Every structure is written in structure tokens, then in C-alpha cells.
């Protein structure tokens, strides 16, 4: 279900503070965050944000096409390695 348009998009306060600080300094550095639920807003464009996937932080470069999506959409948490082999010997 989509968030109501009456509300602003959710962005974690610590993440918003870091983005605004880097924008005023005009610096680019990797921002480490665990906030996968934060929505990407236009002030984040051009920054690299390392999003936690449960094991490590994956660096994601924010582009204009990502605006409106959540940070967690770009850091997959599951790593599918294929189905188990059909081992008939173990069925005995």
C-alpha cells in the first residue's frame, strides 16, 4: 500500500542530516546507513550511500531515476544459489 500524499516521504533523520551537511560543504563521501526504509529524495542525487543488506554494506550511487524508491530496493538481502540436487541415495 502506498504512503498517503498528505504525508512527506519517510527519510531517517540521521541520513537527512548527513545529506544536507554534505550538500552545504559540496563534498562527496560514502554515507553508511542501516535505514533500508528511507525513501530516496532529490537532494540525495549524486551521493553514494552504503545500504546494509544484513551482512555487509553495499554502496549504491543515487541517480535521478531512483527518486521515490526505497533504499532497500537496491540492496538485495537473499542470495539464491540454486535448488538442491535431487539425491536419490538419501531417500532410503
From Swiss-Prot:
Cellular component GO terms, alphabetical: chloroplast; mitochondrial small ribosomal subunit
UniProt keyword terms in alphabetical order: Chloroplast, Plastid, Ribonucleoprotein, Ribosomal protein, RNA-binding, rRNA-binding
Keyword Repeat: no
Compartmental location: Plastid, Chloroplast
Pfam families for the chain: Ribosomal_S19 (PF00203)
Chain ranges passing through the membrane: none
Biological-process GO terms, alphabetical: ribosomal small subunit assembly; translation
One Gene Ontology MF term: rRNA binding
Role: Protein S19 forms a complex with S13 that binds strongly to the 16S ribosomal RNA.
Family: Belongs to the universal ribosomal protein uS19 family.
Protein name, entry field: Small ribosomal subunit protein uS19c
Organism expressing this protein natively: Morus indica (Mulberry)
